[in-house]
From Swiss-Prot:
The gene is mrpl4. InterPro entries: MRP-L47_sf, Ribosomal_uL29_mit. Its main location: mitochondrion. One of its GO terms (biological process) is mitochondrial translation. This is Large ribosomal subunit protein uL29m. It comes from the Eukaryota. GO terms for cellular component: mitochondrial large ribosomal subunit. The keyword Nuclease does not apply. It is found in: Mitochondrion. It comes from Aspergillus fumigatus (strain ATCC MYA-4609 / CBS 101355 / FGSC A1100 / Af293). PANTHER family: LARGE RIBOSOMAL SUBUNIT PROTEIN UL29M (PTHR21183:SF18), RIBOSOMAL PROTEIN L47, MITOCHONDRIAL-RELATED (PTHR21183). Pfam families: MRP-L47. Keywords: Mitochondrion, Ribonucleoprotein, Ribosomal protein, Transit peptide. Component of the mitochondrial large ribosomal subunit. Mature mitochondrial ribosomes consist of a small (37S) and a large (54S) subunit. The 37S subunit contains at least 33 different proteins and 1 molecule of RNA (15S). The 54S subunit contains at least 45 different proteins and 1 molecule of RNA (21S).
């Protein structure tokens, strides 16, 4: 057995003679580290000491709408009395606005749901050649007429889904497809005008003038 181990065992056994020491083959099991790790005596906690339990300063502690527990003292709603609801018989009748802008999101008969006969009664879409002859103001007005009509179709489709009517989907989809073709044509015409303006600006920067050709003729 190593001398340091024998000396350490002798000190730990309070000076017992060598006869009472364990045999040498048990020395590895009785080997202790020279530096002992400190043993923690208190339980682990991530809370600071100054943040220990004290007086609860939360006045709404325990207030729960689920368990129907209210505050510890009564609270007033307001310093003014609550208004009392008016009975329907005493309400003042208001006249409807016949020309309100929101009526544009409903059919002409102002019903909440458009009928298949109403949705299928429409013409064809505008062709690109017809749209080329329109002015900027006409194209602008036609675009927003298409937008309002598509919003009306979307409103009817939402109401149809809510009521689970089971009819009118095909007619509304065909009407919406026709309107989208017109909108795509308006975009195409505006794109052509934009390219034409870009080409004219490029030619002007290069020095081209239409009146020069007229003078040569």
């Amino acid at each position: 057995m190593h001398r340091q181990s024998v000396a350490r065992l002798t000190r730990q056994c309070h000076g017992l003679p060598l006869v009472e020491l364990p045999p040498p083959y048990l020395a590895p099991s009785l080997h202790f580290s020279l530096i002992r790790t400190p043993v923690q005596c208190s339980s682990f906690s991530s809370t600071a000491v100054v943040a220990g339990r004290g007086r609860d300063l939360n006045k709404t502690r325990g207030v729960s709408a689920i368990h129907r527990t209210g505050p510890r003292f009564k609270l007033g709603v307001s310093k003014y009395p609550l208004p009392k609801p008016v009975s329907p018989a005493a309400l003042e009748k208001r006249e409807a606005t016949p020309n309100h802008g929101l009526w544009g999101f409903f059919p002409r008969d102002r019903s909440a749901l458009s009928t298949p006969e109403y949705d299928i009664a429409h013409g064809r879409s505008w062709s690109i050649q017809e749209l080329r002859e329109k002015s900027w103001e006409d194209l602008h007005c036609l675009w927003w007429v298409c937008v309002k009509e598509r919003n009306r179709i979307a409103t009817s489709n939402l109401e149809r889904q809510r009521l689970k009517a089971g009819y009118g989907e095909w007619e509304a989809r065909e009407r919406d497809r026709t309107i989208r073709i017109t909108q795509n044509g308006i975009k195409h015409v505006l794109r052509e005008r934009w390219y034409a303006w870009e080409d004219a600006k490029r030619l002007y920067k290069k020095g081209y003038r239409p009146q020069d050709e007229e003078n040569q003729e």
